[in-house]
Amino acid sequence: MLYSLAQKFMFQMDAEQAHDLAIKSLKFTANSPLACGYSQALQSSPVNCMGITFPNPVGLAAGLDKDGEAIDAFHAMGFGFVEVGTVTPKPQAGNDKPRLFRLTKAKAIINRMGFNNKGVDNLVRNLQAKKTDILVGVNIGKNKDTPVEQGKDDYLICMDKVYPYAAYITVNISSPNTPGLRTMQYGALLDELLASIKAKQAELAEKYHRYVPVALKIAPDLTADEIESIAMSLISNQFDAVIATNTTLSRDGVEGMTHGTEMGGLSGAPLTAASTMVIKQLASFLNKKIPIIGVGGINSAQDALDKFDAGANLVQIYSGFIYQGPKIIKEIVNAVKMK
């Protein structure tokens, strides 16, 4: 009830202004009596993935809390884990505004944010300041002005800094809003990046006496051959997980709608089937050698169950959370318990 009132108010505002207000409000109310407005108790539904025991299989996808400002509030809502970021070595403003658009009729969002964030050092301070023990994954990317050929250096810089505080680290090479980034999903560039990440992981594991898993986040706009190639690279480089999928460049399901032709990545309900298909194909190629975190168009408990049936070990939500509110977390956890 409270969320539906807040949503009604927020949906009258510009999408990015509403997002920023929500994060500020959650940051202010977290760990205070005001958190009772959105906190909820969930049944325990532990899942072991990447060598980590998650209290439940429902996580917050990267992009909502880029700078890790409201982590404790999301813990109160019942998320099993939170993924912050995408964060880059240097702060960057991102693309010009407006750059975030609701397509309410389709329960969808288009964004062309462009990795706007306050930089990795700021994120580390926020990770140090969190008061709860919620598991936090950190999604890392490259700065816009870093050439693709040197992109791996940005990932290694971020990895170095977040490693002591992250439950796992996600390498994001699949945002459509950083020029050239998706070219890193293929061939020699991908293998070079994955090998560099694994070498850095080994170095940091020895330094901190702690193994932090690494995951790769991929796009939905891939052919079966490209998915197979990525799967083989993940296996050969012994990556710990893959996150499928990021936003899509397709506009199927939003044709003719207001904002439907805006540039950027489309998320939400129109992505549901495509994302689930990528998970299914990945699962067949990976043959349970590497776990899959499913994300993309989860707007109901059934959507989440479909992701699990396709081969996902965990799921993440973002657009569905915006449209449904915290109740969707409980609905998914309860549905998983009943399976």
UniProtKB/Swiss-Prot annotation:
Monomer. InterPro entries: Aldolase_TIM (IPR013785), DHO_dehydrogenase (IPR050074), Dihydroorotate_DH_1_2 (IPR012135), Dihydroorotate_DH_2 (IPR005719), Dihydroorotate_DH_cat (IPR005720), Dihydroorotate_DH_CS (IPR001295). CDD domains: DHOD_2_like. Binds 1 FMN per subunit. This is Dihydroorotate dehydrogenase (quinone). The gene is pyrD. It comes from Shewanella denitrificans (strain OS217 / ATCC BAA-1090 / DSM 15013). HAMAP family: DHO_dh_type2. Its cofactor is FMN. Belongs to the dihydroorotate dehydrogenase family. Type 2 subfamily. It is found in: Cell membrane.
